[in-house]
UniProtKB/Swiss-Prot annotation:
GO terms for biological process: lipid transport. Its main location: plastid. Residues 158-168, 251-288, 340-350 are chloroplast intermembrane. Pfam families: MlaE (PF02405). This is Protein TRIGALACTOSYLDIACYLGLYCEROL 1, chloroplastic. Residues 118-136, 190-229, 310-318 are stromal.
Length: 350
């Protein structure tokens, strides 16, 4: 047995040659080589790939010449580039997805406001989105408001009749619907129906590079995709809220009359005495704010989607959840700002 070596630049890899008719040779280069550079005091480590080859050598019986064949080869996925031994702190840290998505919300909202002020509105897309958000969402909103109104009526009538406050039931229902229930319930329904649609549509366009195609064609995605959805949501939510308030009060009055024997006239008269114009105006303002929150968050989550079909699903779910959280936070802030101090709306209903 004799030993040879193959010299390649400054590296030596030993090989062994076996004078046999059938031989299996395993070649394993070194895993780590230390290289010193003249004039440099800093050392670098070069990781060479680990290669395992199985060679079969067969001698021809006729002429004695060897024939060699390679059966398999396995290569590690280690990084071959020179790397410093001492890494800088936080060199591999990247911000969370929620951080840069949260930062994209005020940026996109500001761009939408600038487009509206400059008059850069794509009216055809705006009307299409307004039809989707308004009339096509009306049935679900009215159905939800009907059953929520009847559920609250059962609780209020059951307790107020024991106290002899039948004439206050309509006022309490009217205040609850106008100030809280109608705007919040309508926004929740729209967030589940349209917010998810916005995030899924824009997310699919983002991962399929359709937004890049719009930029190549000279169309701004903010003008063409996002601004129409924001305008449609802000315009449709107040009208949906008003319709939900009307249907909710009607269902409550019908249930009170049919089940508990409280006349519809008593419910309507009590509601008329308790309600004030500011209650309806505050509901409209709340619904507009909620519509802006739903559309901006859903569009922001959509245009920042990555990861293909899985990323689209995650963005859609996350957009709806964050929209609901934003609705509840905004509802608390607006309610604490609109209705401060002690109220006297029910004093005329007793």
């Amino acid at each position: 047995m004799m030993q040879t070596c193959c010299i390649h630049q400054s590296f030596c890899f030993p090989h062994r040659v076996f004078p046999r008719f059938d031989a299996s040779i395993g070649i394993k280069p070194p895993k780590l080589c230390q290289v010193g550079f003249i004039g440099k005091t800093q050392s670098y480590g070069i990781s060479s790939p680990i290669r395992q080859r199985r060679l079969y050598v067969n001698l021809n019986a006729n002429d004695g010449h060897p024939s060699m064949s390679m059966l398999e080869e396995e290569t590690s996925t280690e990084n071959n580039a020179p790397s410093q031994e001492a890494e800088l702190p936080f060199s591999k840290w990247s911000p969370s997805k929620y951080i840069w998505r949260g930062l994209s919300v005020p940026i996109i909202a500001g761009q939408v406001v600038l487009r509206i002020l400059k008059g850069k509105i794509h009216w055809r897309n705006t009307l299409q989105q307004l039809e989707r958000t308004g009339p096509k969402s009306l049935g679900v909103c009215l159905l939800t408001s009907t059953f929520v109104g009847m559920a609250f009526t059962i609780q209020f009538v059951r307790e107020f009749t024991r106290l002899g406050l039948n004439r206050s039931i309509g006022g309490v229902l009217a205040l609850a619907f106008s100030r809280e229930l109608s705007p919040v319930i309508t926004s929740i329904v729209v967030a589940g129906r349209m917010g998810s649609a916005f995030a899924a549509e824009l997310g699919t366009m983002q991962v399929s590079e359709q937004t890049d195609t719009l930029r190549v064609l000279g169309a701004d995605p903010i003008d063409y995709l996002i601004t129409p959805r924001v305008i449609a949501s802000c315009l449709a939510l107040p009208f949906l809220t008003l319709m939900c308030f009307t249907v909710g009060m009607a269902s409550s009055a019908l249930l009170s009359d049919a089940v508990y024997g409280i006349s519809i006239n008593i419910i309507m008269d009590s509601a008329h005495r308790a309600l004030r114009p500011w209650d309806i105006v505050s509901a409209m303002i709340k619904s507009q704010v909620f519509g802006a929150i739903i559309s901006v968050i859903s569009c922001s989550w959509g245009v920042t989607t990555t990861g293909g079909a899985k990323g689209v699903g995650e963005s859609t779910t996350s957009a709806v959840v964050m929209s609901l959280v934003g609705i509840f936070i905004a509802d608390f802030v607006l309610s604490s700002f609109f209705f401060q101090g002690a109220g006297d709306s029910l004093k005329n209903c007793v």
